[in-house]
UniProtKB/Swiss-Prot annotation:
PROSITE patterns for the chain: RF_PROK_I
Residues where N5-methylglutamine is found: Q232
GO CC annotation: cytoplasm
Biased composition (Basic and acidic residues): 281-305
Principal location class: cytoplasm
GO molecular function, one term: translation release factor activity, codon specific
UniProt PTM: Methylated by PrmC. Methylation increases the termination efficiency of RF1.
Key words of the record: Cytoplasm, Methylation, Protein biosynthesis
Keyword Cytoplasm annotated: yes
Protein family according to the UniProt entry: Belongs to the prokaryotic/mitochondrial release factor family.
Name of this chain's protein: Peptide chain release factor 1
């Protein structure tokens, strides 16, 4: 591990020298690539340098343990104990930083939320989930754009699809795929009985042209009139678009825009991301056919989390985590929840790496 870290530090220093060159600065394409490579290495190099500094301080303190002055020996002993306890933590941090990066982590994300069992209450819960992710995105400084929405009669969502754009969106949201269950008393419930309903969430990395090739011969495009809640026509022209990808059977519809061209562009964006996710799932299943991911498969049918409003708790069943801060989570303050999922995934990756070695 440490030989690899030394190589990374040398690479980092080489990049710093190149970035200081006027020749590189004048070549903006090269400058951008080197800047990104430099940024990718900075965290691990900074931690490695801190680790080496701790090691050096520990060696210096151990020399003072033989000092003639008992007070200096005592101080050196206490300092050495403190340094020895800090070093294993830094070593684990370095191990985590050296784990292979998910190439999709940097991507923007398409979030698909669909009401499940529970009728109108499920549609209202789907809207609550969309608001939670939107508020979280706002807190993170990300941008949310609705690509498609099918509203229910009570103001919920039968389905809503949105694009979230920002820094490392997929890395933070990728564990959200699955079935989310809610337990609460609906506003229409006169007896005060708790109802259970559900919504499914799918998290897809936004596909770029280089990621997915969609051949024109592989798709069928149908146009139709857009309709709103209750089935009433909201557009007299055939602006809504339905795209069918015939090889995979994936169907995407979009009717939010008045322009057929804009609806087609949005539907193509969703289709490309679904195809990319399908390919990633296929590769994942091939590589991990003999073991199931401990954070969950991301299968939409998998119940991953329960939101219990009477008790004010949210429970993630994959990692046995319960937080009694449901109100804050629903307002987008979900950092602790997402951090716990990310940490668990990293821990499992370290275990898997140790098993291979």
């Amino acid at each position: 591990m440490f030989a690899k870290l030394e190589n990374l530090e040398r690479r980092f220093e080489d990049l710093e020298q190149q970035l200081a060159s006027s020749e590189v600065f004048n070549d903006q394409d090269r400058y951008r690539k080197l800047t990104k490579a430099h940024a990718d290495l900075k965290e691990v190099v900074d931690v490695f340098r801190r680790y080496k500094e701790l090691r050096q301080n520990l060696a210096d303190n151990k020399e003072l343990l033989d000092d003639a002055d008992p007070e200096i020996r005592s101080m050196a002993h206490e300092e050495a104990k403190s340094l020895e306890s800090a070093i294993p933590e830094i070593e684990q941090e370095l191990q985590l930083l050296l784990l292979p990066k998910d190439p999709l982590d940097e991507k923007n994300t398409i979030v698909e939320i669909r009401a499940g069992t529970g009728g109108e209450e499920a549609a209202l819960f789907a809207a609550d989930l969309f608001r939670m992710y939107s508020r979280y995105a706002e807190i993170r400084g990300w941008k949310v754009e609705i690509l498609s929405a099918n509203e229910s009669d009570t103001g919920g969502y039968k389905e809503v699809i949105a694009l979230i754009v920002g820094d490392k969106v997929y890395s933070r949201l990728k564990f959200e795929s699955g079935t989310h269950r809610v337990q609460r008393v609906p506003a229409t419930e006169s007896q005060g009985r708790i109802h259970t309903s559900a919504a499914t969430v799918a998290i897809l990395p936004e596909a770029e042209e280089v990621d997915v090739e969609i051949r024109p011969d592989d798709i069928r495009i149908d146009v139709f009139r857009a309709s709103g809640a209750g089935g009433q026509h909201v557009n007299k022209t055939e602006s809504a678009v339905r795209i069918t990808h015939m090889p995979s059977g994936i169907v995407v519809s979009c009717q939010d825009e008045k322009s057929q061209h804009k609806n087609k562009a949005k539907a193509m964006k969703v289709l490309a991301s679904r195809l990319l996710q399908a390919e990633q799932d296929r590769q994942h299943n091939e590589m991990a056919a003999d073991r199931r991911s401990q954070v969950g498969s991301g299968d939409r049918s998998e119940r991953i989390r329960t939101y219990n409003f009477p008790q004010g708790r949210v429970t993630d069943h994959r990692i046995n985590l319960t937080l009694y801060s449901l109100d804050r989570v629903m307002e987008g303050e979900a950092q602790a929840l997402f951090d716990a999922l990310s940490t668990h995934a990293q821990t499992e990756a370290l275990k898997a790496q140790a098993d291979v070695q």
